[in-house]
């Protein structure tokens, strides 16, 4: 069964109300790749649908971006920075915590929209995490770590791996649920990569917008693609903006 993102996204759009009369989001881009630009387009479409004004600006230098942040954040409910050039830090560390709607920094009151999206998908389709063995192939502060924290709070047994983990498939092939977010193209291409009946959620996206998993080659029955996760992530991002 495909865990489609659209019905999850639609439910979030319909039920999450704004605490502000005029919610707005500032999207800053620094050396954006194709994935960043695709995400921006999705954010703009979603903002138009749910009534969140979206302003985007691309900065060429970090210092210029810091200045823009300091001068512009007070005019927006939330701020996100799309800067895949940096794995951490960069402009994101200068976002005020109360405006940090994508959980870029530890003091943010929100998890990242992507991490929340994975949990929303699992909840929507009635996946009980208690007692399940979950393997997360990502150790980042915005995806892997918050997901591990949330899943542990649901009494799952969580193993966190990454692209450098030795014999990675030894872990994924034993998991009840796999969430992968490497973003370097097809990483899993064999039926042996996952056990029969496992749920596989692909969050990864490379420069050609390909995910981490070749679902057909792996013969995965229960799955969500990066497009499914992306659809829910944009809805969760807008929900965070409405809460800010």
Per-segment meaning from a language model:
Residues 30-44, 62, 112-199, 213-215:
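Glycine-rich phosphate/diphosphate-binding loop of Rossmann-like nucleotide-binding domains
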Residues 1-22:
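Positively charged, low-complexity intrinsically disordered leader regions
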Residues 82-87, 142, 183-186, 205-207, ...:
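Short glycine-rich anion-binding loops that position phosphate/pyrophosphate groups of nucleotides
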Residues 91-103, 196, 201-244:
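Rossmann-fold NAD(P)-binding glycine/threonine-rich loop
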Residues 34-74:
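Active-site cofactor/substrate anionic-group-binding motifs, chiefly glycine-
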């Amino acid at each position: 069964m495909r865990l489609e993102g659209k019905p999850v996204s639609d439910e979030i759009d319909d039920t999450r109300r704004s605490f502000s009369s005029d919610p707005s989001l500032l999207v800053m881009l620094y050396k954006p790749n194709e994935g960043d630009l695709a995400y921006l387009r999705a954010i703009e479409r979603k903002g138009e649908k749910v009534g969140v004004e979206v302003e985007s600006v691309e900065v060429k230098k970090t210092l210029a971006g810091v200045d823009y942040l300091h001068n512009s954040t007070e005019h927006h409910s939330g701020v996100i920075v799309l800067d895949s050039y940096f794995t951490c830090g960069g402009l994101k560390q200068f976002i005020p915590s109360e405006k940090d709607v994508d959980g870029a920094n530890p003091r943010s009151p929100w998890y990242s929209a992507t991490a929340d999206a994975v949990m929303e998908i699992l909840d929507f389709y009635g996946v009980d995490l208690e007692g399940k063995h979950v393997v997360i192939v990502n150790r980042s502060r915005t995806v892997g770590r918050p997901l591990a924290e949330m899943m542990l709070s649901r009494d799952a047994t969580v193993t966190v791996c990454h692209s450098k983990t030795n014999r990675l498939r030894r872990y994924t092939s034993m998991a009840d649920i796999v969430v992968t977010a490497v973003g370097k193209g097809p990483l899993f291409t064999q039926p042996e990569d996952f056990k029969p009946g496992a749920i596989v959620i692909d969050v990864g996206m490379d420069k050609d917008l390909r995910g981490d998993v070749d679902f057909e080659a792996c013969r995965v029955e229960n799955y969500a693609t990066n497009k499914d996760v992306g659809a829910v992530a944009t809805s969760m991002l807008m929900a965070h903006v409405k809460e800010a």
